[in-house]
């Protein structure tokens, strides 16, 4: 049976389903093909359920580490299985919302694996819609990414990726997390607050190595205080799953001495690579980059007419909100509607939802000076310890830091670590996107008392006149 659509979206993750909705809003007949996760990794086993677990962990942290601060008396126990059950319910609710949106926008759901026969035809295998042939005018590839692993390390029952970990309702007693990026550090926060003996091994010289160095220091201090062991500057050289226990060999960089940890479980979190295999992409003529991602232009167009790509498979910046933004550009381009390209992906915001939270975009001071050696770069940092709302919340760790051009006040980067940093960064993203200067940000009246006043104060600092510090 052959069906024809104006637009077919391959993959129902955050980029895929958003692009489908936008295309349908613009009058296109749209179908989405998905083999497993409607809402993608993000809604099912990533962003959404992990935030539920983190909230539970924050509550546990308050009762176990801050009892004296808040006058809490008596003993309270925390059940990880109950926290896990809540996270699955949260995920199910949000995924149900995706199906509702498909129906609301008259988008056809096709359940199965879409395989390209050629640049205008997809064949569905697996799933309840296996056997269908789908033709299209335009196709948006939103197939996401797959996890990397360490050389010589295979996933097994006790050596897992984030996906197996987040689906497991049982917390181990002792665990190693390989990789101190956002995912590794979020899981370390959750499990550490549920009494798991967690060790994080990171090859780079600090945790969250892609963030500002001072941000990394704040996070490292908070985690050590919480009892999480951090081993930055160490290489994981071998992982052996012995059934009842796992052995992890590691070496400090520059040393020949091998040490071994024996734990119940190991989670490997060392990044992702674009998912470009397993769906017949080679039958389309679509070109890949040297990194193995689908090559696109500013409008998400590939080199093949009528085929677009968005999200992790493009490797521009592998974040759900970036995929969503790309999806809207792709849909509007297909429909011939007015759109706005995304510009420099360096200026896209990112966050790590540990506690304190981390968020950033743009350049660090060092990066800015290296990129613009002839420009005077100014940096201002305002500590949350000087922010009244943060003091009232007893969440005074961290700071709001702004990197700017001294002459024009152009916003070149922002780096936040502290309470609700993921919410505070968006004001600065908007300002950067619309070319507001740091002076204009500082002159915008902010409600008192709020955490966002720290952002205003940092902007004042670029001009040399912070008020409350």
Curated annotation (Swiss-Prot):
Comment on bound cofactor: Binds 1 FAD per subunit.
Coiled coil regions in record: none
NAD is among the record's keywords: yes
Cofactor(s) required for function per UniProt: FAD
Origin: domain of life: Bacteria
Miscellaneous comment text of the record: The active site is a redox-active disulfide bond. Overexpression of LPD enhances sensitivity to menadione, but has no effect on sensitivity to paraquat or hydrogen peroxide.
Function in brief: Lipoamide dehydrogenase is an essential component of the pyruvate dehydrogenase (PDH) and 2-oxoglutarate dehydrogenase (ODH) complexes. Catalyzes the reoxidation of dihydrolipoyl groups which are covalently attached to the lipoate acyltransferase components (E2) of the complexes. Also catalyzes a reversible NADH:NAD(+) transhydrogenation, and is able to transfer electrons from NADH to various redox-active compounds and quinones. May be involved in quinone redox cycling in C.glutamicum.
Annotated protein name in UniProt: Dihydrolipoyl dehydrogenase
Binding site for FAD: 34-42, 51, 114, 312, 320
Disulphide bridges: 42-47
InterPro entries xrefs: Class-I_Pyr_Nuc-Dis_Oxidored, FAD/NAD-bd_sf, FAD/NAD-binding_dom, FAD/NAD-linked_Rdtase_dimer_sf, Lipoamide_DH, Pyr_nuc-diS_OxRdtase, Pyr_nucl-diS_OxRdtase_dimer, Pyr_OxRdtase_I_AS
Name of the encoding gene: lpd
Organism listed in the record: Corynebacterium glutamicum (strain ATCC 13032 / DSM 20300 / JCM 1318 / BCRC 11384 / CCUG 27702 / LMG 3730 / NBRC 12168 / NCIMB 10025 / NRRL B-2784 / 534)
UniProt similarity note: Belongs to the class-I pyridine nucleotide-disulfide oxidoreductase family.
């Amino acid at each position: 049976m052959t069906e024809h659509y104006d637009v077919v979206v391959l993959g129902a993750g955050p980029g895929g389903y958003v692009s489908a909705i936008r295309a349908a809003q613009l009058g296109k007949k749209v179908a989405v093909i998905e083999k497993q996760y409607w809402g993608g990794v993000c809604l099912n086993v990533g962003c959404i359920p992990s935030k539920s677990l983190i909230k539970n962990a924050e509550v546990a942290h308050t009762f176990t580490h801050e009892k004296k601060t808040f006058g809490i008396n008596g003993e309270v126990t925390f059940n990880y299985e109950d926290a896990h059950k809540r996270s699955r319910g949260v995920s199910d609710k949000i995924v149900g919302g995706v199906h509702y949106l498909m129906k609301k926008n008259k988008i056809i759901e096709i359940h199965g694996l879409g395989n390209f026969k050629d640049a205008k035809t997809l064949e569905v295998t697996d799933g309840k819609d296996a056997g269908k042939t789908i033709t299209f005018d335009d196709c948006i590839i939103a197939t996401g990414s797959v996890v990397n692993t360490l050389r010589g390390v295979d996933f097994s029952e006790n050596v897992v990726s984030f996906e197996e970990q987040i689906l497991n309702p049982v917390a181990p007693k002792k665990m190693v997390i390989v990789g101190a990026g956002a995912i590794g550090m979020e899981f370390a926060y959750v499990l550490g607050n549920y009494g798991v003996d967690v060790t994080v091994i990171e090859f780079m010289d600090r945790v969250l190595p892609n963030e500002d160095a001072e941000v990394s220091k704040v996070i490292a201090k908070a985690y050590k205080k919480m009892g999480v062991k951090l081993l930055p500057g160490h290489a994981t050289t071998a992982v052996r799953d012995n059934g009842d226990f796992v052995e992890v060999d590691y070496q400090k960089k520059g040393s020949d001495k091998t040490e071994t940890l024996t734990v119940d479980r190991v989670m490997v979190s060392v990044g992702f690579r674009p998912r470009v295999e397993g769906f017949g992409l080679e039958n389309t003529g679509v070109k890949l980059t040297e990194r193995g991602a689908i090559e696109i232009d500013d409008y998400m167009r590939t080199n093949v007419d009528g085929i677009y790509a968005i999200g992790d498979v493009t490797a521009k910046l592998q974040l759900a909100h970036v995929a969503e933004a790309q999806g809207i550009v792709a849909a509007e381009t297909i429909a011939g509607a007015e759109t706005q390209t995304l510009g420099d992906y360096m200026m896209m915001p990112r966050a790590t939802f540990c506690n304190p939270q981390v968020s950033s975009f743009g350049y660090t001071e060092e990066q800015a000076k290296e990129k613009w050696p002839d420009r005077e770069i100014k940096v201002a940092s305002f500590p949350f310890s000087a922010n009244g709302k943060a003091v009232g919340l007893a969440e005074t760790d961290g700071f709001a830091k702004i990197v700017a051009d001294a002459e024009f006040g152009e916003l070149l980067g922002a780096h936040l670590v502290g309470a609700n940093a993921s919410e505070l960064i968006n004001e600065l993203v908007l300002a950067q996107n619309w070319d507001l200067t740091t002076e204009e940000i500082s002159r915008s009246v902010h409600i008192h008392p709020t955490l966002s006043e720290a952002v205003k104060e940092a902007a004042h600092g670029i001009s040399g006149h912070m008020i409350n510090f």
